């Protein structure tokens, strides 16, 4: 025997079964590790989809800005979508009714259901004119409504308003729990209604602008850039913390906990 390397084939023959078991254990460990982190990733992805369906696919909400400021923000290259949102009669006590049932009047634009809440649109399209409206499925079912039908909204101070239905929206838990219909109008029409009616002393016209960034790789940096460049304070900007947490772009530790659990399982596999 001239070299120690000559022992390798001899050892391989003697320990053939042991070598096969070692290879099997290594392959099994790799499979388990891949499965663990794959399941963690699938869980995070499923939670992101669920959260986007429940709370909307928006990253921040901005309030107390003018429509001109909103237009500037919407034109930024790092903003994929911006949708205004306002509600009258959210508490169901201001006297806006449809067929004697209180309604929450919501004002926005077509990007609300195209980008921010894409899963809420069940049929039709967002109103293109001030004379059109969308209603929730509860109103459709109770009043046997169809696209193209006319509905009449009674107001507390002004005359009744007639709208042509352009589509239907999924019910929300808040509206269902309060036995209230939801009616969606253009932003301009809702503001006109606000000016026409007393609104029981409602002060101001607070509009929230939902913002969806084009990239989610560094949302916190984009938020800070938006604040500094547009002169926004921390009180004006609110985050969709649940969604950002799942995307790893929030101080929320949920996603970190999921991957930490996967890492612990990985260590256990190594020791096994």
Residue ranges and their predicted role:
Residues 16-44, 251-272:
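Hydrophobic alpha-helical transmembrane segments of multi-pass inner-membrane transport and secretion
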Residues 2, 6, 241-248, 258-264:
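Alpha-helical membrane and juxtamembrane elements of multi-pass inner-membrane transport
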Residues 41-248:
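Basic-flanked hydrophobic alpha-helices used for secretion and membrane insertion
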Residues 1-21:
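Feature of multi-pass inner-membrane transport and sensor proteins
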